């Protein structure tokens, strides 16, 4: 997007893509108000790039309110796409969907849960009422996460093939008795996962979240028998983990705000008020906090894979090491070449976010970072499953103007920038192999390279995140390519498992939609075996499934939870059970009757589906996706609240287009439903 001032005395400059500063001599005139006229041209590539407001910035870099007011057209609720289509989700379509869901709205049975249990044999109708654990025993089984519950009127006997299996057995027993307060029938439950890894990638870089919130999310993950957290700790916009020998990563890289020169901290991007000391913009985990967090996760059966993006998505690391050089004179960790004239633009529109593999600094940098991370895991007494290097989205031309890269490629017989990227991945794999740790990366480190590269690198790669491309057929090609090359894929495709996507195209829904929209049913339909394998034999090579929660649009802990729940139940189902289990209707009934109320009792926020609405003659009828939820409505075009009339039957309204409805259930509320224009 371009912005220009109309008055030649005013100045406008782009700080970073989509973010500008404006200077005007009138700002110093002491007037009560100032009018600055600007002309904008183009489009923002993603909704997440918009700032929250217009701010003034004082000499210390602190934003202050300038009383900016923008007029919005609120008269037309329709959601227009780039192609000019009305993409609002209207009442009649939702009514039909809710009607279909209610065909299978029977209350769940005592052993219904997500992920669903493999084998339940009810032995009598006698009930166990207190859920007391009578015994725990380790048994041999082909699957290391196999467990068995023997439920008798006296209590529960637990058997499991491993420490992790026993922990999952205890959690399953706890859930059974929480959701069946009158008691659980006498039964034998045998359960095991189809995939060894069932995880979440959580980004705390774009917007920061405390370890207290992360522990709450980990508790929710463990409850659903998820066992892996890919912790996204470094990206273009921030660095969130203390690395003691490189303090600039925190003093510079853990803050973000409005600045014209980025000398003290990076420029503001994504949501937030631009305060470099604000909760979303500023934050990091100390070594001691991270060690404690690793132990917390380990106690709940969750392994943590730390992720530090490279060679792309490295803007903050590059600038933090520039800051180190400016303030200490130490250039040994320089990550880019001052003489580099490369012109490129990343997926996030950055022009300066790729470190240079032809320099010694990046290897020195990651040698120090990885040593510190390994030491933290050793101190915590837990396994480091892999060191995730990112490896994705390196823009074309990133090193085309680098004299060092040109000379390096000639010296090492590297043909192009793709070969230089491959060299980086291989060097990182070798570095970590010397330390006894495998690497992991996004699919970009595994696909479109020759067999010689794959033979050398694949044995040192624990897994690759198969996030697939916009073209699904090409995505299947990448999955097959990764398998054929000897890499182990973790299915993370954006079509089912990007949980920062909006639930629908309704304009009130939170989240991005660059790859479509995803509700819990779309995630439930994310069968890993349909994405990667070339044959049934390849299905055994799939490591599992993983949800992705990118943080560009996350502005609060409660919003994080609304993105996760109830989609996390669907993700857990597909990771535990590779084949069909729930219909949409049965899954929705389980959520409505059991899981959403339980989330509310445990203090989690969650997303709520919306009510349906349609005209029948001169009256408006409404319906709910959940049996016990309340529909509240208005007839004057205003947004319904808890104090609005409760829907109990058909509504007559002089203007049907002015009727609005929302669903309310256990503290949550839906987006607003309305009728289409005639």
Describe each model-derived feature in a short phrase.
Residues 8-37, 42-50:
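Short beta-strands within extracellular/lumenal beta-sheet-rich domains
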Residues 11, 84, 88-91, 95-190, ...:
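Acidic, contiguous N-terminal accessory segments
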Residues 18, 48-49, 54-101:
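Extracellular carbohydrate recognition and processing domains
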Residues 111, 116, 142-378, 382-386, ...:
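Feature activates predominantly on carbohydrate-active enzymes
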Residues 346-463, 469-474, 479-481:
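Active-site neighborhood of glycoside hydrolase catalytic domains
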Residues 438-446, 451-618:
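Flexible, acidic glycine-rich loops studded with aromatic residues
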Residues 578, 582-678:
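Short, compositionally stereotyped local motifs that mark structural "simplifiers"
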